[in-house]
Amino acid sequence: IRLRRGTADEAYALVARAAALVEQAGLAQAAVQFHDPSGAFRDRDQYIFVFDRSGTYQVFGSTPGNVGKSVFDVRGLDGDFVLREFFAAAQRGGGWVDYEVVNPVTGAVDEKTSYILPLGSERVIGCGVFKPKGGFSLQA
């Protein structure tokens, strides 16, 4: 049985592969693959995102048209919290960050968690999963 949603383990693995590709090929070349809707970096509801310290998206795997937009413009997302906590996780070498965002499928505010890695000191790369009701435990 294949779940309709990606899992935390799959998000973690996707971010690790994506960060390795950026290191090998550079962000511009990697972004082409991250934005390919049938590519290796899109899996069900999972996709890669990258943004800089100002909160500007440089990659938004599910919606490439959001590149250049700000985390502050994402409906139902606390941009200040996300920016602060994602970069704090990156400064620790990577980690999980829990937050709330409007689920684009249901329109409800849902809990989400994203695995974040640093891309140098000025960018973060990540992938998130909506948390099931009742939660789950994360290990990284």
Predicted regions and their residues:
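Short, hydrophobic beta-strand elements of compact beta-sandwich sensory domains
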Residues: 1, 15, 112-134
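Extracellular/periplasmic ligand-binding regions of membrane signal-transduction receptors
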Residues: 3-33
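Soluble sensory domains of the PAS superfamily and closely related sensory modules
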Residues: 15, 25, 29, 79-99
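Extracytoplasmic ligand-binding sensor domains of the Cache superfamily
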Residues: 38-92
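A short beta-strand signature within small-molecule sensing/ligand-binding domains used
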Residues: 46, 106-116
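Short loop/turn segments at beta-alpha junctions that line or gate ligand-sensing/allosteric surfaces
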Residues: 75-76, 99-106
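Membrane-interface helix-start motif
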Residues: 135-140
